[in-house]
Amino acid sequence: MNKEAYIQMFKDTDALLEGHFLLSSGKHSAKYLQCAKVLQYPNLAEMICRDLAEYFKDQQIDVVIGPALGAVTLSYELARQLNCRSIFAEREDGIMKLRRGFKIEEGEKVLVVEDVITTGGSVKEIIEIVKEYKGEIVAVAGIVDRSGGKVGLGYPLKTLLTLNIETYEPDECPLCGEGIPIVKPGSRKVK
């Protein structure tokens, strides 16, 4: 599928929201991509992950890992497409870690996934976990890179959509200046 088709998919599932949003990164934005609204449809999740899997089918990935909650479905379906394991990391006392008996064996080839990448904060936390376990990171994958390709993660990044959606520091946000109420739609508590 092309970029326009993916954008239309977000619109058709009411996953492209407009307003005033507090992102997990702590930044503000006039647009929010709620991937869960797309991924709630198994046929769309399968289609998205099939397209992503094409980039990694010859990489012999051993495990796909992403942060809970946003990347759990993405990690699972992408791992199914790549015929490998899927695990996720989650926060415990504010720190991202592997729980539930999940582990990465030394030398395993790992694909890190996230649904939407803005600053790469959650992805960087996952990368650190993989390094702790001495896994070999092959790449980072996602549905949307909303940084416009500006986020640097130190590994190849492959997303289906690269959008340049403006974000603002809270003290520089024009939406705050206009008095527009802010909404926090994500899954991570912002400090």
UniProtKB/Swiss-Prot annotation:
Positions of 5-phospho-alpha-D-ribose 1-diphosphate binding: E114, D115, V116, I117, T118, T119, G120, G121, S122
Pfam families: Pribosyltran (PF00156)
Lipoprotein recorded as keyword: no
One GO MF term attached to the UniProt entry: magnesium ion binding
Domain of life, per lineage: Bacteria
PROSITE patterns the record matches: PUR_PYR_PR_TRANSFER
Residues the entry annotates as binding orotate: T118, R146
Catalytic activity: orotidine 5'-phosphate + diphosphate = orotate + 5-phospho-alpha-D-ribose 1-diphosphate
UniProt-listed Enzyme Commission number(s): 2.4.2.10
Keywords: Glycosyltransferase, Magnesium, Pyrimidine biosynthesis, Transferase
Cofactor: Mg(2+)
One example of a Gene Ontology biological process annotation: pyrimidine nucleobase biosynthetic process
Enzyme class: transferase
UniProt cross-references to SUPFAM superfamilies, sorted A to Z: PRTase-like
Pathway recorded for this protein: Pyrimidine metabolism; UMP biosynthesis via de novo pathway; UMP from orotate: step 1/2
InterPro entries tied to this protein: OPRT, Orotate_PRibTrfase_bac, PRibTrfase_dom, PRTase-like
Protein family: Belongs to the purine/pyrimidine phosphoribosyltransferase family. PyrE subfamily.
Known role: Catalyzes the transfer of a ribosyl phosphate group from 5-phosphoribose 1-diphosphate to orotate, leading to the formation of orotidine monophosphate (OMP).
Assembly notes: Homodimer.
HAMAP family linked to this entry: PyrE (MF_01208)
Protein name listed in UniProt: Orotate phosphoribosyltransferase
Origin species: Caldicellulosiruptor saccharolyticus (strain ATCC 43494 / DSM 8903 / Tp8T 6331)
